[in-house]
Regions:
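Exposed, interaction-prone regions of secreted/extracellular proteins
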Residues: 25-26, 30-290
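Secretory targeting and sorting signals
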Residues: 2-32
Length: 290
């Protein structure tokens, strides 16, 4: 079943950049650590790369169809493929709704070419079978051969991606969570390595349906389709938890889908591995950019 591709970039990033000026400086919270000082050219490049993200959304699952082959390793597991997602989603095939999702990872290191590419890593509620996503995570952007890393949140489609931290670095220890209470969603990122990238924000959504929980590596999409996926090598999600009603568990506690990212020809772009023995972790491996 095909779904609408999200409008994630109003134009190709490289084409947008000449129209952008320098971004307004980000002020970390009191007591937060800051990244090392950049030279003026490096600071300008970082500002342009960040400014290009103003038009970026990290949106909903673009396609949903079964991958050939059985999925017998984990009870309740379904294998599907997507043109923009890789990872796991807990769904609502048994009527579940979700109120909390958490995940942990070490920020992957992106290998860049001269081409612009993107890779987003996040946890969230909704988006797998619904039109909204309440999410937060990190993002690797390859721009002119250099990798830039950010922390962000988004209440799709209400707002574009909200970049908070611009000093995320490969190896940073990231914890992400989304918690619902009533119509309020608290989105929190903790960067235990560089605290300037940490944040907590509470947003309101009265129409969100909470019918899925996700742990995802994503290739964002623009007006021309799915953008090239940055070579992040591997992304290892660990210590994932989820809550549905009064039940607390891990990914495998609820009906879960293993999602592999493919291109329009069916070739694998990012391969999702099996859940670990605890049912709370997995690895996504990059295979191609497009």
């Amino acid at each position: 079943m095909h779904r609408r591709l999200p409008w994630l970039l109003s134009c190709a990033l490289a084409a947008c950049v000449p129209a952008f000026g320098l971004v307004v400086a980000y002020s970390p919270t009191a007591g937060a650590s800051t990244a090392p000082a950049h030279s003026r050219p490096e600071a300008r490049a970082l500002a342009i790369a960040r400014q290009a993200l103003r038009h970026l959304d990290v949106g909903q699952h673009a396609t949903d169809h079964r991958v050939s082959g059985s999925a017998t390793r984990v009870k309740g597991l379904t294998q599907v493929s997507s043109t923009n997602w890789a990872g796991y989603a807990d769904d609502n095939t048994k009527g579940n709704t979700y109120s909390k999702v958490t995940g942990k990872w070490s920020e992957p290191s992106a290998s860049c070419t001269s081409a612009t590419s993107l890779a987003a890593f996040w946890v969230g509620i909704d988006g797998y079978t619904s039109a909204s996503v309440e999410q937060d995570g990190t993002l690797a952007e390859c721009y002119l051969g250099t990798a830039y890393y950010f922390s962000w949140w988004e209440m799709y489609p209400s707002n574009a991606i909200q970049v908070v931290g611009e000093s995320v670095a490969p190896g940073d220890r990231i914890t992400a969570s989304v918690v619902k209470s009533g119509s309020r969603y608290t989105l929190k990122i903790t960067d235990a390595t560089h605290s300037a990238n940490s944040f907590t924000t509470t947003q309101t959504c009265s129409s969100c349906v909470d019918t899925s929980a996700e742990w995802i590596a994503e290739a964002p999409s623009g007006s021309s389709g799915v953008e090239p996926l940055s070579n992040f090598h591997t992304w290892k999600e660990s210590s994932a938890t989820v809550k549905s009603g009064s039940a607390k568990g891990v990914i495998s506690t609820f009906p879960d889908d293993e999602i592999t990212m493919i291109n329009s020809s069916g070739a694998t772009k990012a391969k999702t591995g099996s859940l670990n023995s605890s049912g709370n972790g997995f690895t996504v491996t990059w295979e191609r950019s497009s």
